[in-house]
Amino acid sequence: MSKQPHILVSNDDGYLAPGLLALVNAVRPLGRITVIAPEQNHSGASNSLTLSRPLSIHRVAGGERDGFFFVNGTPTDCVHVAMTGFLDEKPDLVISGINQGENMGEDTLYSGTVAAAVEGVMFGVPGIAFSQIDRGWNRIEDAAKAAHDVVAQMLVSALARTEGTATLLNVNIPNRPYADLYRWRVTRLGNRHHSQPVVVQDSPRGEKIYWIGAAGEVKEGSEGTDFHAIAEGCISITPMQLDLTHHARLAAMRANGWDRG
């Protein structure tokens, strides 16, 4: 890119999340940065938009997050308002994360982290979602350095200038020192078994309450999948698309007379 690229950064863990701050600091040398993130944690929000109430946007003044914007909405809300009026012009790249925990296989359908990158692609802007394979933040700076390398590669790649549908990448980073994060694998999504059963408890009022169970174990994690790459200690980079059409089944249904009239 001839001009300094404009990078929009969001997440689903909220604007105070350590993963967001680490990502922003890591990519600052790569371009002009705008941060618009949710006010609260919206993990599992997927591509939900807030339509039942107005949204408000506030700017952080002072501290290490000075200049960050936060929205009382979802990750998708954040990128949507940025693209449809809050920003004077569309950014060159949308990045999201770094998420606290992996987003692999079917996780991507539920993930607010992935959804923020997806929303950028909906507006023709390449998007990258970053997640770290850990529920803690003990190696978040290492993951951020690796994310910097992926963003730098994207900015000089033909993928960033592809005509037509913008590129969408889902990146999962092992919980390892940066020196060990030099191996990248381009992968496909693996597959999990169904989630664990809901956890049933009694509320103080004697009512049954239900907690969503833990993610299922890996069902299909063969070579070439995101699960396999992570198990091998590699960064997993999965190109994704918005078109959910099952094209082979579409052709089969047409061939078998499903078209009528």
UniProtKB/Swiss-Prot annotation:
Listed EC numbers: 3.1.3.5
Cofactor(s) in the UniProt record: a divalent metal cation
Top-rank taxon, per record: Bacteria
Protein localization: Cytoplasm
Pfam families tied to this protein: SurE
Cofactor note: Binds 1 divalent metal cation per subunit.
Binding site for a divalent metal cation: 12-13, 43, 99
Primary site of residence: cytoplasm
An example Gene Ontology CC term for this record: cytoplasm
The keyword Mitochondrion belongs to this UniProt entry's keyword annotation: no
GO molecular function: 3'-nucleotidase activity; 5'-nucleotidase activity; exopolyphosphatase activity; metal ion binding; nucleotide binding
SUPFAM superfamilies: SurE-like
Cross-referenced Gene3D superfamilies: Survival protein SurE-like phosphatase/nucleotidase (3.40.1210.10)
InterPro entries, per the entry: SurE, SurE-like_Pase/nucleotidase, SurE-like_sf
Keywords: Cytoplasm, Hydrolase, Metal-binding, Nucleotide-binding
Swiss-Prot/TrEMBL catalytic activity: a ribonucleoside 5'-phosphate + H2O = a ribonucleoside + phosphate
Annotated NCBIfam families: PRK00346.1-3 (NF001489), PRK00346.1-4 (NF001490), surE (TIGR00087)
Functional note: Nucleotidase that shows phosphatase activity on nucleoside 5'-monophosphates.
HAMAP family linked: SurE
Similarity annotation: Belongs to the SurE nucleotidase family.
Protein name: 5'-nucleotidase SurE
Organism, as annotated: Polynucleobacter asymbioticus (strain DSM 18221 / CIP 109841 / QLW-P1DMWA-1)
Taxonomic classification: Bacteria, Pseudomonadati, Pseudomonadota, Betaproteobacteria, Burkholderiales
